[in-house]
A protein has these predicted regions:
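Amphipathic alpha-helical interface elements
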Residues: 1-122, 129-158
Length: 158
């Protein structure tokens, strides 16, 4: 997570360097891509971490993709240990985590273009069908903070 955090935090400097080497539009597109990819990297890292921790705790191996579904992953831990994700995150953090995971899904599988299924699944009122998800630096950093907090909590489970 530290590498992803440093990358996200240094995007302005990278954009300046890339602008010197290429042009402003190319630099902007490259930095936007890195920022969008950070969502995927964080979610993928969390999925694998949660799968491994769950197996360590329960002896049961679940599909790694089960842990990109926030409620499902939380339920696995709750059923096994009595503590779901809500034991470690506030309700607001859980809501944001679910939203970020949904945004990552639409970025990965629909090139960031919002469809009705995304709106129905996420409840995201910031976008309409046909618009493109825009990842903000503060959102990427927020997702990292939430995942670090949740991962620390999961590490306390036995």
């Amino acid at each position: 997570m530290n590498t992803i955090t440093k990358m996200v935090q240094s995007l302005d400097e990278m954009k300046a360097t890339l602008t010197d080497q290429f042009d402003m539009d190319t630099a902007e597109a490259m930095c936007r891509s890195m920022l969008e990819n950070s969502f995927g990297q964080v979610v993928s890292a969390f999925q694998k971490f949660a799968q491994c921790k769950f197996k360590e705790i329960s002896g049961i191996e679940k599909r790694v993709n089960d842990f990109q579904m926030v409620d499902k992953g939380s339920q696995y831990f709750r059923n096994e240990t009595g503590s779901g994700y809500e034991a470690f995150l506030s309700s607001d953090e859980l809501i944001r985590m679910k939203l970020y995971f949904q945004r990552r899904h639409i970025i990965e599988h629909n090139t960031g273009i919002v469809d009705q299924k995304y709106i129905d699944n996420s409840g995201d009122n910031d976008y309409s069908v046909g618009q493109r998800i825009v990842v903000k630096t503060c959102e990427a950093l927020d997702l990292i903070t939430i995942i670090k907090k949740l991962s620390s909590g999961i590490c306390t489970l036995i």
